[in-house]
Amino acid sequence: MVSWIISRLVVLIFGTLYPAYSSYKAVKTKNVKEYVKWMMYWIVFAFFTTAETLTDIILSWFPFYFELKIAFVIWLLSPYTKGSSVLYRKFVHPTLSNKEKEIDEYITQARDKSYETMMRVGKRGLNLAANAAVTAAAKGQGVLSEKLRSFSMQDLTLIRDEDALPLQGPDGRLQPGPVGLLDTIEDLGDEPALSLRSSTSQPDPRTETSEDDLGDKAPKRTKPIKKVPRAEPPASKTLKTRPKKKSSGGGDSA
């Protein structure tokens, strides 16, 4: 465990950070010799990192494995041994030069196939997502309609239960529950005379109180009202005509 931690620290510090800073200095100073040196190192270190991933799984049980890895990194980086330059010139550069065309073709094919695969997978993913959204919306609509239907049925049952429950009066006694509106209309339709009698038989509290108040108060004197004689129409004067007397002379002559 300790050797693994030490090897990781050596690889990170001496194998990655220090070469990165040296490459920065080479680019800044535009030193072609240093630039070529660190470019060869990074190519060799990339192959080392790829091989390390596999060997850590397969050969980690081997004795002094991590110590050998530390020594290899130092050998690559040391300016005395120049291990990275030796490996690049003897193994890496000849191999890449012989396989360069094949590697370029593989890279081009892989890029095209990966693009086509990505587009095909993307289309399938979009279709699946659209179908899933449609089915989820349909199921959700069905569930929502069922819930609304169940809620409406529950409300009706609750209203019926509330109508059936008796009410408790102020004296603690149970009173019958309120009659439904339809029942009251039916009762009124069956017995209209009874409803009218009950409405007319109730005394008006205002009239009772007013009569009692009038009985308590003393009667006030009222002035007698003089009767005005009616004006009779004037009687029409009748003219009396006296009868004419017969002349006495005429009688004597006869």
Curated annotation (Swiss-Prot):
Record-linked InterPro entries: TB2_DP1_HVA22 (IPR004345)
Ranges of biased composition (kind: Basic and acidic residues): 205-219
GO cellular component: cytoplasmic microtubule; endoplasmic reticulum; endoplasmic reticulum membrane; plasma membrane
Subcellular location: Membrane
Record keywords: Membrane, Phosphoprotein, Transmembrane, Transmembrane helix
Region (Disordered): 194-254
GO terms under biological process: endoplasmic reticulum tubular network organization; protein transport into membrane raft; regulation of intracellular transport; sensory perception of bitter taste; sensory perception of sweet taste
Modified residues (Phosphoserine): S152
Main localization (coarse): membrane
Record keyword Iron-sulfur present: no
Family: Belongs to the DP1 family.
Subunit structure, interactors included: Interacts with odorant receptor proteins.
Protein name (Swiss-Prot/TrEMBL): Receptor expression-enhancing protein 2
Source organism of this protein record: Mus musculus
Taxonomy of the source species: Eukaryota, Metazoa, Chordata, Craniata, Vertebrata
Name of the gene this protein is made from: Reep2
